A protein has these predicted regions:
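An amphipathic, aromatic/His-enriched active-site/gating alpha helix that lines ligand/cofactor pockets
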Residues: 20, 24-36, 55-89
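Short, well-ordered beta-strand segments in beta-rich or mixed alpha/beta enzyme
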Residues: 2-9, 39-66
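N-terminal first-folded block
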Residues: 2-36, 40
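Short loop segments at secondary-structure junctions
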Residues: 12-13, 57, 94
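Glycine-rich beta-strand-turn "strand-cap" elements at beta-sheet edges
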Residues: 2, 40-46, 76-99
Length: 99
């Protein structure tokens, strides 16, 4: 299992446009084979900061996600929205358990 966690910086004035562009991509991503979780969340104290959390079954599923049409559409739309610093980390997990 692969976990991705991190942040994406967005100009606060573009948050509505980013939200609109991201919604279709997120909805399609959640339907992908191998996608366990996929979420963007706006920071409550810093409106220009988006927290990203992803869980994938394996590397093949993550690779297919990166090559998908909806990710290409997201990258094209996001290019004009002033997306700033991206800080994402990939983690490998053996198993998870409720806490």
């Amino acid at each position: 299992m692969l976990l991705i966690a991190g942040t994406l910086r967005i100009p606060a004035e573009n948050i509505d446009a980013v939200r609109a562009a991201a919604q279709a991509m997120i909805a399609e991503t959640r339907k992908e084979d191998g996608c366990i979780t996929y979420a963007f969340a706006q920071d409550l104290l810093d409106p220009g900061l988006i927290h990203i959390s992803e869980t994938w079954r394996d590397g093949a599923a993550l690779k297919a996600h990166g090559e998908s049409a909806h990710m290409a559409a997201w990258r094209a739309a996001a290019g004009g929205l002033g997306l700033g610093e991206r800080d994402l980390k990939l983690y490998r997990a053996v198993e998870g358990q409720p806490i």
